């Protein structure tokens, strides 16, 4: 909507990240590296700037390899996920930025990345897997609505010579 485009544009303008386009008409997609700091994620500084969660407002915040993020960095997202805004307080003033974003996260169920892969050796012990997964707190997991396990598909199954259905056939079916 126009209201969402204006909100998103304002946030990017305040952060000094507004491209030469006057109005942002595409939803933001933000994908910070797992080494990000608390301040870079939620915002801050002596004059509080928006962080990644506000830069993702009205869009998607994608966290790849979720357990690789520091636990305290993940925990600072809990309240903004709940409230859809983040408040940054400093000695002289307080700033509130919107942070209504869709959180999408990916992760392997083990540090080796090969759990449930029949073609790879299992290199992580159950204890290592538990320690790896425990980096993500229950309260944060509660704020993630959909959990999907994707099992490995052998390359041969993806690349075999089966004939694909034509667009004409699909159109007739629909």
Regions found by a protein language model. Give the residues of each.
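AAA+/SF3 P-loop NTPase mechanochemical coupling elements
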Residues: 26-30, 48-49, 53-58, 88-109, ...
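Inter-Walker segment of RecA-like/P-loop motor cores
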Residues: 20-43, 47
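Phosphate-sensing "switch" segment of ASCE/P-loop ATPases
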Residues: 95-100, 110-174
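Short gly/ser/thr-rich secondary-structure transition/capping motifs
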Residues: 42-47, 84-89, 127-131
């Amino acid at each position: 909507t126009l209201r969402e485009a204006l909100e998103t544009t304002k946030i990017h303008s305040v952060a000094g990240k507004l491209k030469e386009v006057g109005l942002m008409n595409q939803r933001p997609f933000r994908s910070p590296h797992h080494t990000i700091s608390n301040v870079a994620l939620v915002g801050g500084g002596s004059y509080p700037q928006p962080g990644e969660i506000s830069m993702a407002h009205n869009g998607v915040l994608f966290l790849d390899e979720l357990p690789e993020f520091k636990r305290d960095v993940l925990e600072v997202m809990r309240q903004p996920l709940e409230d859809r805004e983040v408040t940054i307080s400093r000695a002289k003033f307080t700033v509130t930025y919107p942070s209504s974003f869709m959180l999408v996260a990916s992760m392997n169920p083990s540090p080796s990345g090969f759990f449930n892969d029949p073609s790879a050796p299992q290199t992580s012990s159950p204890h290592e897997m538990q320690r790896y997964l425990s980096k993500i707190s229950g309260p944060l997991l509660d704020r993630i609505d959909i959990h999907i396990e994707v099992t490995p598909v052998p390359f041969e199954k993806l690349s075999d010579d089966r004939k694909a259905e034509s667009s004409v056939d699909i159109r007739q079916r629909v």
